Amino acid sequence: MNPERFTEASAVAINAAQQLAQENHNQNLTHFHVLRTLLDNDTASRALTLAGGDLNTARAALDAEIAKLPKVQGSDGQLYLDPALNRAFQKADTLAAQLGDSFVAADTLLLALRGEYRGRGLPDEVSLNRAVTEQRKGKTVTNKTSEQQFDALNKYGTDLTQRARDGKFDPVIGRDEEIRRVMQILLRRSKNNPVLIGEPGVGKTAIAEGLAMRIVKGDVPEGLRDKKIVSLEMGSLLAGAKFRGEFEERLKGVIDEVVKSAGEIILFVDEIHTIVGAGKTEGSPDAGNMLKPALARGELHLIGATTLDEYREIEKDAALERRFQPVFVDEPSVEDTISILRGIKERYQVHHNVEITDPALVAAATLSNRYITDRQLPDKAIDLIDESAARLRMALESSPERIDQLSRRKLQLEIEREALKREKDVDSQNRLLDIENQLKTLTDELNEVRSRWEAERGEVAALREKREKLDAVRTQIEKARRDYDLEEAARLEYGELPALEKDVQDLEKKLKSAEFAHMEVTEEDIAAVVSRWTGIPVSKLMEGEREKLLHLEEQLHGRVIGQDRAIVSVSDAIRRARAGLNDPNRPLGSFMFLGPSGVGKTELAKALAEFLFDSSDAMVRIDMSEYMEKHTVARLIGAPPGYVGFEEGGQLTEAVRRRPYAVILFDEIEKAHPDVFNVLLQVLDDGRLTDGQGRTVDFRNTLIIMTSNIGSPLILEMQQRGEDAETIKSAVMDELRGEFRPEFLNRVDDIIVFDALTAKDLQSIVDIQLGGLRRRLAERRITLHLTEDAKDKLAELGYDPAYGARPLRRTISQYIETPLAREILGGQIQDGSVLNVDYGDGGFTFNSGSLN
């Protein structure tokens, strides 16, 4: 037979059969080899399944037949055609002519081979013939790739109505208005193609699934009754289309099948913007252009879904856009989201085998709405429920902490016992006896705890099984009602269902008092997941954290000396935020710190970051002296489109997007260009900022601190004159109004004037500054002690009211660190010694002694 008579799919199967024969050392190419490789072909395997055959059984039977064939070792690899296969090829040629085919397709070859082999797993010839006819839907093979068009919808699509019948979808709650609008558009005479447009995660695909469920239930107008919704997979259409025209052929097959159904099939294309440009090569049309004629005539019913941004791809092609009717899908409110979560809760309970409490659903909707701002409801709330349930399920299926502790203790004692067995002295033997007794007690306790845990695990497994049965019975009841099988529906509803519900309730009640199996997802679990996602502490305050917050001032006083008013004001803002009383639409707090250089403005910001995040580096620090020119505003929020660096994002916006809970320090704000303050107005008032790429960045969980040296000479002068704090603040505010616009100052929560440091303050700062040196010396096991005289002298030498505490650092470096370095290098001070520093006779003296 002429090899050119075979389609590509048939030729691939025959080549694979030759390879299979050579691998098995068979000299004859038989019908078993070809039939075995043909079962891996899409068209042939689908026809076989459709006819009632069993693919796995057929493959196993053919493998057994091939194993029985004679093997020839060391031959030249020459293959001979088996007479039975030759007959099958002749028959296939005849069948192709009868069907009006120009080439022998894979399904024709399967029919011919079925006549030669009647093994297990294969259907009878009549059923197979019927299946091939049904699959072809009247199409003939006119070229080598024509099979791409056979049963195109089943190959490249998913039947949503069938999935709805099988109970695969979660219930669609709400969205009645959008589903009604989609049905209204589908019933139009022409341009009956709705496209669902909305942000990612608002439930566009769910609307198509909801419509499929309504069609299955019969809850649709007469014009849509018994219609079929098929979801088209653009990826499957494109995958493997190697040659020009192959993609178009597949798509043409889909379009023809939908058009031929005369409105009975509705196509659903998720991410519909992908049809613009899909499959386009030089000189060939894209998918969008191929769909246009059928869409315009109303022959092709199509539902699309895409996001607002990606719909622009379709808007570029006005001729395609006019064929669609947009249906805008808005994000549901928090209340609607809670209703949606209540509707789908059952499915997640069955999947994870846990109980999801109602407060957890409310927490998922409210917390995701407040803290996860870059995604949409209900998607982000569903994700929270899913992850919290998965976390609890993982804990349920892992070994409990109590068993872990006992197992580790047992292992430790066993190692100790083995070591003591080698010792012969009396003490070791007594200790060995003691360990043996401990091990016996521990093993008994471990076995008892383990048996209790195993019993609870058994109950958890039983509950999962019952829940799955309950879910299956509910699906069967729905099906029986749809089919008007009222007897079956009554048997299930009044026979099996109540018994299963009672079993589930009994097991749930029993597991509520379980020692290890904690089955409930609570609002604390949801809060813990939100904290892990965003880094924002939203979980309930622990006792230790309450104490820490109430004594926040004392902690900050340990780092920042002499600034009581500033510390109290900032501490109150943090307490309000953690108690949940701050305005949810503004940052946690915004402060402007004014005062002379070196009095602790930046240090207080670092101390706050350390308190909140356990690291003084965990803050976003923006040095405003870098933003003195007008064009540098773009560096904060990101360059606009068309400029270099557009993709990179802004220094401020990107930092906050990655870490939404942060202390943001704008250092030396008076040095920035006035336009920078216009950017900050939105942040201070609404807690939001739009970056260069149009994304909204959420600042509602940030603490904003701005530092400035404005009025520093005035503060020093007035403090030396002995003026009170209010008079000083009033004078500084007058100077501040000359520098900043009222709308900017008005948005700041509190403007705090830092006091100039006194000589007494500096004595306290000496200890803080020496702390770093002590830590560095501790690495060499050197202990440093300073007498009060030495500290007083350092404070005196380092005191300069105009420069604050910064000269003190230089003083310590000059009078303590430099001489110390010389003595360490000279060998006078050894590692592990105690160093006493004193002041007398006009200089500092260093005496070292052994640590012992």
UniProtKB/Swiss-Prot annotation:
<dbReference type="InterPro" id="IPR003593">
    <property type="entry name" value="AAA+_ATPase"/>
</dbReference>
<feature type="coiled-coil region">
    <location>
        <begin position="382"/>
        <end position="513"/>
    </location>
</feature>
<keyword id="KW-0143">Chaperone</keyword>
<dbReference type="InterPro" id="IPR027417">
    <property type="entry name" value="P-loop_NTPase"/>
</dbReference>
<feature type="region of interest" description="Repeat 1">
    <location>
        <begin position="6"/>
        <end position="69"/>
    </location>
</feature>
<dbReference type="Pfam" id="PF17871">
    <property type="entry name" value="AAA_lid_9"/>
</dbReference>
<dbReference type="GO" id="GO:0042026">
    <property type="term" value="P:protein refolding"/>
</dbReference>
<feature type="region of interest" description="NBD1">
    <location>
        <begin position="151"/>
        <end position="331"/>
    </location>
</feature>
<feature type="region of interest" description="C-terminal">
    <location>
        <begin position="757"/>
        <end position="852"/>
    </location>
</feature>
<feature type="region of interest" description="Repeat 2">
    <location>
        <begin position="81"/>
        <end position="147"/>
    </location>
</feature>
<keyword id="KW-0346">Stress response</keyword>
<dbReference type="Pfam" id="PF10431">
    <property type="entry name" value="ClpB_D2-small"/>
</dbReference>
<feature type="region of interest" description="NBD2">
    <location>
        <begin position="545"/>
        <end position="756"/>
    </location>
</feature>
<feature type="region of interest" description="Linker">
    <location>
        <begin position="332"/>
        <end position="535"/>
    </location>
</feature>
<comment type="function">
    <text>Part of a stress-induced multi-chaperone system, it is involved in the recovery of the cell from heat-induced damage, in cooperation with DnaK, DnaJ and GrpE. Acts before DnaK, in the processing of protein aggregates. Protein binding stimulates the ATPase activity; ATP hydrolysis unfolds the denatured protein aggregates, which probably helps expose new hydrophobic binding sites on the surface of ClpB-bound aggregates, contributing to the solubilization and refolding of denatured protein aggregates by DnaK.</text>
</comment>
<dbReference type="InterPro" id="IPR036628">
    <property type="entry name" value="Clp_N_dom_sf"/>
</dbReference>
<dbReference type="InterPro" id="IPR019489">
    <property type="entry name" value="Clp_ATPase_C"/>
</dbReference>
<dbReference type="InterPro" id="IPR004176">
    <property type="entry name" value="Clp_R_dom"/>
</dbReference>
<comment type="similarity">
    <text>Belongs to the ClpA/ClpB family.</text>
</comment>
<feature type="binding site">
    <location>
        <begin position="198"/>
        <end position="205"/>
    </location>
    <ligand>
        <name>ATP 1</name>
    </ligand>
</feature>
<comment type="subunit">
    <text>Homohexamer. The oligomerization is ATP-dependent.</text>
</comment>
<dbReference type="GO" id="GO:0005737">
    <property type="term" value="C:cytoplasm"/>
</dbReference>
<dbReference type="Pfam" id="PF02861">
    <property type="entry name" value="Clp_N"/>
</dbReference>
<keyword id="KW-0677">Repeat</keyword>
<feature type="domain" description="Clp R">
    <location>
        <begin position="3"/>
        <end position="147"/>
    </location>
</feature>
<dbReference type="Pfam" id="PF00004">
    <property type="entry name" value="AAA"/>
</dbReference>
<dbReference type="InterPro" id="IPR041546">
    <property type="entry name" value="ClpA/ClpB_AAA_lid"/>
</dbReference>
<dbReference type="GO" id="GO:0034605">
    <property type="term" value="P:cellular response to heat"/>
</dbReference>
<keyword id="KW-0547">Nucleotide-binding</keyword>
<keyword id="KW-0067">ATP-binding</keyword>
<dbReference type="InterPro" id="IPR017730">
    <property type="entry name" value="Chaperonin_ClpB"/>
</dbReference>
<protein>
    <recommendedName>
        <fullName>Chaperone protein ClpB</fullName>
    </recommendedName>
</protein>
<dbReference type="InterPro" id="IPR003959">
    <property type="entry name" value="ATPase_AAA_core"/>
</dbReference>
<dbReference type="InterPro" id="IPR018368">
    <property type="entry name" value="ClpA/B_CS1"/>
</dbReference>
<dbReference type="InterPro" id="IPR050130">
    <property type="entry name" value="ClpA_ClpB"/>
</dbReference>
<dbReference type="Pfam" id="PF07724">
    <property type="entry name" value="AAA_2"/>
</dbReference>
<keyword id="KW-0963">Cytoplasm</keyword>
<feature type="binding site">
    <location>
        <begin position="595"/>
        <end position="602"/>
    </location>
    <ligand>
        <name>ATP 2</name>
    </ligand>
</feature>
<dbReference type="GO" id="GO:0016887">
    <property type="term" value="F:ATP hydrolysis activity"/>
</dbReference>
<dbReference type="GO" id="GO:0005524">
    <property type="term" value="F:ATP binding"/>
</dbReference>
<keyword id="KW-0175">Coiled coil</keyword>
<dbReference type="InterPro" id="IPR028299">
    <property type="entry name" value="ClpA/B_CS2"/>
</dbReference>
